[in-house]
Amino acid sequence: DGQIKLRGNRIELGEIENAARMVEGTENVCALFDAAKQEIVLFVETKGTLPPRQYNRELRKYIPAYMLPQRMVTMEKLPHNANDKIDRTALKKLLA
C-alpha cells in the first residue's frame, strides 16, 4: 500500500511524507495514490505559512521531480481515527 508504480517509477509514499514534514510550517501530512486519476495527492495540515505553489518549490529540495505530488490539498486539520492516527480511509473518500 505504501509503494506505488507511477510512469515507470517505483515511489514510496512514506518518502514523500517524510520530505513534506521537512518543509517549514508543516504539521501533518498524508500522501495517497489516486489510482483512478493516476496521481499522487498530498494532504497537508500547515500553519498556513506557505502558499501551495511555494510549498511545492520547497518540497522539490527534498525529493526528485518524479516523486512530486500532482495535487496538494491543504486542510486546517487532517482527520484522525480512534487511535489518534491520520485517518487514511477518510482521506481516500475525499478522492472519490
What are these regions (language model features)?
Residues 1-96:
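AMP-dependent adenylate-forming
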